[in-house]
Curated annotation (Swiss-Prot):
Monomer. The active site is at S175. Its main location: membrane. Keywords: Cell membrane, Flavoprotein, FMN, Membrane, Oxidoreductase, Pyrimidine biosynthesis. Catalyzes the conversion of dihydroorotate to orotate with quinone as electron acceptor. This is Dihydroorotate dehydrogenase (quinone). Pfam families: DHO_dh. It is a peripheral membrane protein. It is found in: Cell membrane. It catalyses: (S)-dihydroorotate + a quinone = orotate + a quinol.
Length: 339
């Protein structure tokens, strides 16, 4: 009920303004009695994945809490894990505004944010301040002005800094809004990146006395052959997991709608079937050697179960969460428990 009222108010605002207002409110209330407006008691439905035990299979996808300011608030809502970021080594403003658009009739969003964030040091300070025992994944990326050929250095810098505070680290090479980034999904660039990250993980595990798993986040706009090659590279490098998928450049299901022709990545309901198809293809190629976190267009418990049936072990929500509110977390966990 409270969410429906809040949503009505925020949907009158510009999407980015509404996002910033929501983040500010959650940051302010996360550890106060005011969190009663959104806190939920969700009975545990544990999932063991990447050597970690999560309280339930529903996570918050990266992009919502870029700076890790609201981890305690999202934990109070009942998320099994919270993925913060994408974070880059240095602060950057992202692309010019407006850069985020609602497509309400399709329950979709188009964004071309461009990894706007205050830099990895700011994120680390926020991670240190977390009071809850939330499972936090950190999604890392490269700065826009770092050449793609040197991109791996940015990932290594971020990994080094967030390692002690992360439950797992997600490597984002699939945002469509950083020029050239998706080229890291192919061939020698991918092999070199995965190999370097695994080597760094080994060094950091010795240094900190704990093993923090690393997952690769991939795009939905891949051919069967490309998915097969990525799966092969993940297996060869002994990566810990895959996250499928990021936003799409396709516009299926939204043609003719206001804002449908805006540049950027499309998320929300129209992405659902495409991302589930990619999960299925990826799972077939991985043959159980790596677990998958399924994300993209989940708008109901049924959508989440479809992704689990396709081969994912956990799911993440973002656009569906904006349109449905915290109730979606509870719905998915309950459906998972019955299943």
């Amino acid at each position: 009920m409270f969410y429906k009222i809040a949503q009505k108010f925020m949907f009158q605002m510009d999407p980015e303004l509404a996002h910033n207002f929501a983040i500010g409110s959650l940051k302010f209330t996360g550890n106060s009695p005011l969190n009663c407006f959104y806190a939920q008691n969700i009975k545990p439905a544990p999932v063991t994945m990447m050597g970690l035990t999560f309280p339930n299979p529903v996570g918050l996808a990266a992009g919502m809490d870029k700076e890790g300011e609201c981890i305690d608030a999202f934990h109070a809502m009942g998320f099994g894990h919270i993925e913060v970021g994408t974070v880059t080594p240095r602060p950057q403003p992202g692309n010019e505004q407006p850069r985020c658009f609602r497509l309400k009739p399709a329950k979709a969003i188009i964004n071309r944010m461009g990894f706007n964030n205050k830099g990895v040091d700011n994120l680390v300070a926020n991670l240190k301040a977390v009071k809850s025992n939330a499972m936090v994944g950190v999604n890392i990326g490269k700065n826009k002005d770092t050449p793609v050929e040197q991109g791996k250095e940015d990932y290594l810098i971020c990994m080094d800094k967030v390692y002690p505070y992360a439950a797992y680290i997600a490597v984002n090479i699939s945002s469509p809004n950083t020029p050239g980034l998706r080229s890291l999904q192919y061939g020698d660039l991918l092999d070199d990146l995965l190999g370097s990250l695994k080597q760094k993980q080994k060094e950091l595990a010795e240094q900190h006395g704990k093993y923090v798993p690393i997952a690769l986040k991939i795009a939905p706009d891949l051919s069967s052959e490309e998915i097969e090659k990525i799966a092969d590279a993940l297996i060869r490098s002994e990566f810990d997991a895959a996250i499928a998928t990021n936003t799409t450049l396709t516009r299926d299901g939204v043609s003719g709608l206001l804002n449908a022709n805006e540049a950027g990545g499309l998320s929300g309901k129209p992405l659902n079937s495409l991302s589930t198809m990619v999960i299925k293809q990826l799972a077939d190629c991985l043959k159980g050697q790596l677990p998958i976190i399924g994300v993209g267009g989940i708008n109901s418990a049924e959508d989440a179960l479809d992704k689990l049936d396709a081969g994912a072990e956990m799911v993440q929500i973002y656009s569906g969460f904006i349109y449905q509110g915290p109730k979606l977390i509870k719905d998915i966990v309950e459906a998972y428990r019955i299943k």
